Amino acid sequence: MIVTAIIHLKIKEEVKNKSKYMIAKQLIEPKSIVVVGGSDDIHKPGGTVLRNLQDGNFKGSLYVVNPKMDEVQGIKAYRDVKDLPEVDCAILAIAAKFCPSTVEVLAKQKNTKAFIILSAGFHEENEEGAKLERQIVETINSVGGSLIGPNCIGVLTNHYSGVFTSPIPELNPQGVDLISGSGATALFIMDSGMQKGIKFNSMYSVGNSAQLGVE
């Protein structure tokens, strides 16, 4: 028997006390998304999530940043985030050490308010990674933004498939919202639940829960 409950994204108390923070609309329903680290290789997170965004129901503007490519999966690739236009939501699939500076540019120069960091190598590994994570959270808080992750599989909603997994489960607007620290657990729950007739409206894999977590 699967027990379902109403679960809400919650700001970690230590974060809430330092910033006037609300969950950004750009995370729930972005009008533009950039995949930083997008790849032609669909076996890599940056390749899989880009393919899912294109194959899914995202209707907004989609951008890619890849320093070595002019085009990725048929989309013009920017060599540097500094060259991007303003963008609502950024999905990062790059090495952890590059994430703080990338977030800094997007948040401060590109008016980006929603961040989904797929990359691992943060506080789950060592203190150096924890420091990188804190830098990212501080930057995002300073602009009133939202962060999912790091170290997660992404976000799946009726507006966009920002996850690096396949196949993509079928969603239903009348279903429940699932939030999980573990992406693998979330997918297992969805698969098992759907077999029993449970419908899902969205899935948020919060990973390390550096800013947003589970209440």
PLM feature spans:
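Catalytic-core regions of core metabolic enzymes
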Residues: 5-7, 11-215
